[in-house]
Amino acid sequence: MLEEHYYSRKTCGSGGGLSVQRTGYPQTDPPVFKAVNSFERAPLIVGDHVHSLPYWSRKITLECTPYPFTLRWEGGVHKDGIPDKVPHPSCDPGSELVSYTHSREVDCERFIGPVPSSFTDPKVTSAQWKFLEDMADMKALADLNKSLVNLPMLYKERRETLKMVGNRLGGLVRVAHAAQDRDLKRYFKARRKDRRKVAEEVANGHLELIFGWLPLIGELEGAIEYAELPDLDFIRCHGLHTLVLQSTPWDNSVDVRSYPNWERAAGTRITGSVRTRGVVESRASVRTALRFNLETSLAGDARRLGFEPISTTYDMIPLSFVVGWFSNFDKYVRTLAPLIGVTFETGSRNRRTTCELVGSTRFYPRTVSPPSGWFARWKDFPDGSLSEVSGLRRTDIRSVLSTLPDPDVRFHADVGLFEISAGISLLAQRYLKPLQRLLKRKSFFYGRT
């Protein structure tokens, strides 16, 4: 693999605006923060989502975005201790000391430390790839069912768009003819010496009318472009499933005895520490994309009104959605409907492994040590400088599907915040019964004495 090793740095201004990335930074010193940025692909890189070709690609990036701050300390020396050839600032003639203020800009990029060992390509077993492929295939097949149900709505929307364009154009024509007839009669009714003034008013009125039409003209232009689209002759569907493999914390601390070039400030030495914290997360995912040709304008009479009997019956079962929290059976039900009016053309399956690094670095100053005979003290003691670190290792391998994948039921736990909230609300409705227990009101029946 061809990899270029260099510093990848982003410098941001004080306003937080445009960021500039510099590459090819000279490596005069041994690199502490070693950034890798490479991208390569296989010879076959063509993929137009219609005739998918197999390809693989790899991308590695590691960047640091520093937000520097300024250290300020105050130092001084007795007048007698200053050599004659050393210039010093002007001071009060009656003072015994010469004081000055030094400031240095701090950048944490140099002390970020080595890249964590966990920032590598994740290892995925064959069983995990098989699980991801089955889940992605099932989602793609279920997405096909949804597309077929929504197909009549697309045709209806196109017909309504054409009707809207005709009505708007007819209204514009009627308004233009009415304005033309009204202004023409007004011009001939005016006296000859006033016709020039009337013509100017008519011209200004027409300009106002035209400028008032500009938003409407733009709307009609977009509607006409939509109506001119080619006829729908295919349907695309896709499914994606992701699996988090590992999440490793990253904690690195480096002691700084003296920042580079700070010794120039009259031999003053600054000590501190740099600490980097972050998380390295590894993920694996599979994306299945399928393309079907449409043989009829409407794929099946049952879907003419946006209705599919098998999926609708399953959705009418109480709490049927809970099954989708622990398996893909809800997607499997939607694949049982027969494929009427469509034929499978091509498809692809993309395997992706991702290792993402996110962290931040702070510099904490400790002491400022002046040379012998001098004194120094902090003037502004900052709380630390922040630098953001981000890294990404991503590998893609795509293969072609010549046959339609078969649905396979898999069990998995896919419970997030949304599912937990829904479960709590279901328990509250079942056991708390707020309308009866909170209000404690008995049911009222007519005829009761």
UniProtKB/Swiss-Prot annotation:
It comes from the Viruses. It is found in: Virion. Belongs to the Leviviricetes maturation protein family. The maturation protein is required for the typical attachment of the phage to the side of the bacterial F-pili. Binds to sequences located toward each end of the genome, hence circularizing it. The RNA genome-maturation protein A complex is released from the capsid upon host receptor binding. Maturation protein A enters the cell along with the viral RNA. The record marks S360 as: Essential for infectivity. Pfam families: Phage_mat-A. Keywords: Host-virus interaction, Viral attachment to host cell, Viral attachment to host cell pilus, Virion, Virus entry into host cell. InterPro entries: A_protein. This is Maturation protein A. One of its GO terms (biological process) is virion attachment to host cell pilus. GO terms for cellular component: virion component. Changing R349Q: Associated with poor plaque morphology. Interacts with the host pilus.
